[in-house]
Every structure is written in C-alpha cells, then in structure tokens.
A protein has these predicted regions:
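Catalytic center-proximal scaffold of phosphoryl-transfer enzymes
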Residues: 1-252
Length: 252
C-alpha cells in the first residue's frame, strides 16, 4: 500500500518540478532502493487526475457563472511514441479572472472544439489576445474583447525595426497612457463604478487619438509593415467595459 505522500510527491515532481516519471523511477531506485516502474507512477498520476476532475469542473462552473473571463493558449511540446521521434505541438488553454481562479485545459490542438466545450453558452465578456477562434464560441450574447498588450507589441516591433518612426512611437505612448489609467485605478483601489468613471473621463480622448493615428499610419504603411494590420473593433470598447483589464496577463 503506497502512502498519499508518495503519490502527491510524484505528481508535484512531474508538474511543478518538471521531473519526468522515468527519471523519478530511476531516482527512487538509486536513492531508496525501491523499484517502481514508470507505468506504476503513471497509473498514480492518472488516478489523481480522475480524483481532481470534479474539482476542475466545479472551478469551470464558477468561472462561467461570472460575467468576465480571460482566455489564452500556450503551445507545449508533447512527446509522441509513433516512431518518428518528433514532438507534437499541443496547447494548454487557460481560463480565469484577475485575482481569481484559473482553470487549465490540455488539448492536442488549437481548434475551436476546446473553447467551445469549455465555454458552453457563456454570455459575458471574454477577453483574449484576439485569436479568431473565440469569435465563434460561447453564447449568442458573448462579447469578445481583446488585449491592449498584444496590440502594443505590434507597435513595439515597429519601433525596434524603425526607431525613428514617429507614428509607431506615438501609438505606443498613447497605449501606455491607457495602461496608466488602470494603474491609477489599481493604486487607488477603486471599485468598478469608480473605475468606470475614471475610464469614461480619461479614455475616450486617448482612444480617438489612437484610432486616428492608426488610420493615418495604415494609409501610408506597406502591407507587410507592423503598422498595417487593422485593429479589432472590440478594442475600442475599453471605456465601456470597466471591469475588463487592459491585458490578459493578470492571472495572479
């Protein structure tokens, strides 16, 4: 009979310390003289996953019961035992709220099946990096908002490529001013109503300047330029959705 502590240590070793099961098996034999096959350790991990599944589902339901979600997906390499010796590019999908719970879901691909199943008929505000798959999931009233950090990144790339590009520098400065509004609200610990009032006061003029600057830049930019892509229209709702963050990097 194995103790719970050994099983927990195995799971923590695999997922928190990134120590694969074959290595843990070898370490147990080397350090303790205990022979446990990788398959045995794998069975433990799978059983723990089964026991935690109801908890993960409860967290999912809690997230979907709210009005605001952030979503992101991170590529992970998965070792395949198909004889080719190459890794498969899978994805770890993350759903959560700032300073709230985060649920991770592993999927072998980046298609819409994963978020469609996870989100169900969610009709709140979903914020992402702008990945188009999120436009075709959720309930009929769901609003797909985007992330100013990802928009800003494009203009940072333009500044790095062309340091003297006044249009790109101006856009980065304006977007930074949007982040400063949220930083001011967080520093003052404003509630949602006060945050909305602050955004309503300061954001509209900035958004107009950003939109005008982007329109002007796109009129002269080459198609392959970092300034050429058209921003998603949901990004202009920043002033109205005061409960949404500027970005999707608020998992803690």
């Amino acid at each position: 009979m194995v103790s719970d502590r050994i099983v927990i240590d195995t799971v923590v070793g695999k997922y928190a310390d990134h120590c694969p099961l074959y290595r843990q098996s070898a370490m147990l034999e080397r350090d303790s003289g205990v022979e446990l096959s990788r398959q045995t350790l794998d069975d433990w991990v799978m059983r723990v996953g089964e026991l935690l599944a109801p908890l993960a589902e409860r967290l999912r339901q809690e997230l979907l019961g709210g009005s605001y979600l952030q979503a992101d997906e991170t590529p992970v390499g998965v070792q395949m035992h198909d004889g080719r010796g190459s890794n498969h590019l899978a994805y770890l999908w993350q759903y959560g709220r700032p300073q709230g719970a985060v649920v991770f879901e592993f999927r072998m691909g980046r298609g819409r099946e994963g978020p469609k199943r996870f989100l169900g008929n969610f009709n709140g505000l979903l914020q992402s990096d702008g990945y188009a798959v999120y436009d075709s999931v959720g309930g009929p009233k769901m609003v797909h908002a985007c992330c100013w950090s990802h928009a800003r990144r494009k203009f940072i790339e333009a500044v790095k490529l062309h340091p003297g590009d006044a249009a790109a520098v101006r856009l980065v400065t304006h977007i930074d001013a949007l982040f400063a509004i949220d930083a001011e609200a967080c520093l003052a610990k404003l509630d949602q109503a006060a945050r909305h009032a602050l955004r309503s006061q300061k954001a509209p003029a900035l958004l107009e300047e950003i939109q005008a600057a982007m329109t002007a830049a796109r009129a002269t930019a080459l198609p392959a330029s970092a300034l050429a892509p058209k921003p998603r229209i949901t990004r202009w709702r920043f002033g109205r959705n005061s409960h949404a963050s500027c970005n999707t990097r608020n998992w803690s």
